[in-house]
């Protein structure tokens, strides 16, 4: 395969990956869990995915263990959880 063909194939595969709908990507396994609002010493602004509203909402993460349904930004939350 020539280098030009290989470059074209690589470009097409990259385009295909970018056009793949988010719904076909694997969701974070904890997205359906409620946010862990246990009060610990931390008051860390975070976002959790609300599956009923299909959006990410802000909450105060205490910093103690918790589950995976807490993200630093709403963009990360939506990227990992939105269907």
Curated annotation (Swiss-Prot):
InterPro entries: Kunitz_BPTI, Kunitz_BPTI_sf, Prtase_inh_Kunz-CS, TFPI/VKTCI-like
Keyword Heme: no
PROSITE patterns hit by this protein: BPTI_KUNITZ_1, BPTI_KUNITZ_2
UniProt entry tagged with the keyword Signal: yes
Protein name listed in UniProt: Kunitz-type serine protease inhibitor homolog beta-bungarotoxin B chain
Record's keyword terms, sorted: Disulfide bond, Neurotoxin, Presynaptic neurotoxin, Secreted, Signal, Toxin
Originating species: Bungarus flaviceps flaviceps
Signal peptide coordinates: 1-24
Tissue expression remark: Expressed by the venom gland.
Domain of life, source organism: Eukaryota
Gene Ontology molecular function, alphabetical: serine-type endopeptidase inhibitor activity; toxin activity
Function: Beta-bungarotoxin is a presynaptic neurotoxin of the venom. The B chain is homologous to venom basic protease inhibitors but has no protease inhibitor activity and is non-toxic.
Pfam families from the UniProt entry: Kunitz_BPTI (PF00014)
Subunit relationships: Heterodimer with beta-bungarotoxin A1 chain; disulfide-linked. The A chain has phospholipase A2 activity and the B chain shows homology with the basic protease inhibitors.
Disulfide bridge map: 31-81, 40-64, 56-77
GO cellular component, one term: extracellular region
Subcellular location per the Swiss-Prot or TrEMBL entry: Secreted
Membrane spanning residue stretches: none
Cited SMART domains: KU (SM00131)
BPTI/Kunitz inhibitor domain boundaries: 31-81
Annotated family: Belongs to the venom Kunitz-type family.
